[in-house]
Amino acid sequence: MLNISKIFEEVKVMKNFTLNFGPQHPAAHGVLRLIVELESENVVRVEPHIGLLHRGTEKLIEGKTYTQALPYFDRLDYVSMNVQEHAYSLAVERLYLDSLDIELEIPQRAKVIRVLFSEITRVLNHIMATTTHAMDVGALTPFLWAFEEREKLMEFYERVSGARMHAAYIRPGGVAFDLPMNISEDIYKFVIQYRKRLEEIEDMLINNRIWKQRLVDIGIVSAEEALNYGFTGPLLRGAGIVYDIRKNYPYDDYDKYDFKIIIGEENNSYTRFIIRMKEMYQSLAIIEQALNNLRPGLIKLEGVNITAPDRAFVKKDMESCINHFKFFSEGFIIPANENYTIVEAPKGEFGIYLNANDTAKPYRCRIKAPGFLHLQGLNMMSKDHLLADVVTLIGTQDIVFGEVDR
């Protein structure tokens, strides 16, 4: 007689399958490594392993002057360079200007140029985020179309600073150089032309059946979960929460610009894609307004220690030449003080805690990167989805490991 119970005892219990996902190449969302636990094709657990791109940025900054530390911020989220320079420059300015008895304000022209290039950077980032996300899922054409436009934006970087990526253009006290001739007209032409290109990319993806199947209902995050995990940017606004630092805590006269905060209802991957696409339209509107607000004037504070002497005088006046050399070699002293500065980076809230101690170097610089907090939520977002959906979720988080690992 067949003993059924004995047969069942001999059957081994199936164990979950553990998969090493990555590390990926730095060009593919950074050096990301995941330990993925699977039950068949379904994700049970995702454990991110970080630190493969750790360079000790916060510690390195402690050994540099306030001016020498600026280029490190280009190399954090290397897709959103100018926005991070903007945050650091604001932090240094607030530390320094708070120590003075007189009230000083950054020149109006410098503020407008900062806003202009911060929004150009936002468009740069969202082009990268949306089109590489599409490429990860299998749609190659949007990537090829949009990167042709992205190249034009990189040329604007090059024309104002000489560098395509690591510009070090926004500096404490203002900006490094004034706008070159005819660049305003070229940026305006780009805005008009890119709106049409953006509509073409939308037509290709928004109602695409396969694209929607891969994104809709994937990685749903409730408003409560988004707040608990510390999500900001599109991952928070996708849950219907109206939070944008440019509106909630305006800096450099952002409150004088007319733009909308784009929010969603169902916070899934498709909603976040729509938000990023619509945010590009809002950035184009801000760029237009900034171009209209440009007036002749100074591009940096004058007569204060946090800005370098004008190069025009360096070749004519020995005192200016000496001061210029000492500014970059020895730096400037900031009295003991501390502050925390936040800006609305394309990926979310980018924050800098800066502590001064009566020397020319920061005592402590703590960097809060949005991607670090978003990556914590990847396990929550991936549960009960298929392995193929993990790729979609990495794309929807818009992770860059320069800022995560620091």
Swiss-Prot record:
Enzyme class of the recorded protein, top EC level: translocase
- Membrane topology designation: Peripheral membrane protein
Instruction: Quote the protein name from its UniProt record.
Output: NADH-ubiquinone oxidoreductase 49 kDa subunit
Which Gene Ontology cellular component annotation is one that this UniProt entry carries? mitochondrial inner membrane
Taxonomic classification:
Eukaryota, Amoebozoa, Evosea, Eumycetozoa, Dictyostelia
Q: Which InterPro entries match?
A: NADH_Q_OxRdtase_suD, NADH_UbQ_OxRdtase_49kDa_CS, NDH1_su_D/H, NiFe-Hase_large
Q: How does it assemble?
A: Complex I is composed of 45 different subunits. Component of the iron-sulfur (IP) fragment of the enzyme.
Source organism's superkingdom? Answer: Eukaryota
Which species is this record about? Dictyostelium citrinum
Where does the chain cross the membrane?
none
